[in-house]
Regions:
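Short, solvent-exposed turn/loop segments enriched in Gly/Ser/Thr/Pro and often Arg
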Residues: 7, 33, 190, 237-238
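Short polybasic/polar patches that bind polyanions
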Residues: 21, 203, 226
């Protein structure tokens, strides 16, 4: 049995929901509410000491870190649903290189406009002492919250994140223009699924212009959005808007 502890709007949770949908695997839903601090409760920290989402529990055993979870699902169910890793070693290496890049570049980069556009209002409503207590309770990313400060990320960090996101969409555009319709070969893979939530979030926070001049990237995004797994991962309440 698969149980997924996740947050509706979390990009890392969306990655795993996409993979579960593509694999056709049923799962028990355990939504985590950040506003209530449910990710920092002793019960949740016993499953995931990092205090982040998602966490997959498979037959009672927790698996943490979204990309690790996605690889785990493919490893234990390679012939169930869509195959998400190539069969050859070189193909798998290409996918893993993309996964490393996604973790290091677009995933942290998209947090900057996400936090500035979506979470700053609530963060400002907290007192300095409340913010300090929250940061102290957070096992990971203390530096991230301290840089966020009380006024959001400064312009130089916003500009840097935008440059990193532009690099990401240029790499997607180049990959699908040169080799195949997909990022790492002739078939969809974890590379496509794991970068998609960052692109969706860019759209949600008004950054679609970053890739509007990239036709192959635009086509890739349209094809990804048309897959049945998209609506299963990005259901009502899981998308955000700077107007919310």
């Amino acid at each position: 049995m698969f149980e997924l502890y996740h947050a509706h709007i979390s990009t890392c949770s969306q990655k795993v929901r996409l993979c579960l949908a593509e694999k056709g695997l049923a799962w028990v839903d355990h939504p985590i509410e950040f506003a209530r601090g449910e990710h920092l409760t002793p019960a949740y920290l016993a499953l995931n000491p990092n205090g982040v989402v998602p966490t997959l529990v498979h037959d009672g055993q927790p698996v943490i870190e979204s990309s690790v979870i996605c690889e785990y699902l493919e490893e234990i169910a390679p012939d169930h649903g869509t195959a998400l890793m190539p069969r050859d070693a070189h193909g798998r290496a290409r996918v893993r290189a993309w996964l490393r890049y996604i973790e290091e570049v677009p995933t942290p980069a998209v947090r900057v406009p996400s936090f500035n556009g979506l979470f700053l209002k609530g963060w400002r409503q907290m007192s300095d002492a409340q913010r300090a207590r929250y940061i102290e309770k957070t096992p990971l990313r203390k530096g991230h919250y301290r840089r966020f400060g009380s006024d959001g990320f400064p312009k130089n960090q916003v500009d840097e994140s935008t440059e990193q996101l532009r690099q990401t969409v240029e790499r997607i555009d180049g990959a699908v223009a040169k080799d195949s319709p997909w990022l790492a070969g002739d078939a969809i893979s974890l590379a496509d699924l794991c970068v998609l939530p960052a692109i969706v979030r860019m759209s949600d926070v008004g950054l679609e212009d970053v890739w509007r001049d990239l036709p192959d990237m635009t086509d890739w995004y349209a094809r990804m959005s048309a897959r049945p797994s998209f609506t299963k991962a990005f259901y009502p309440g899981s998308r955000v808007s700077v107007a919310d």
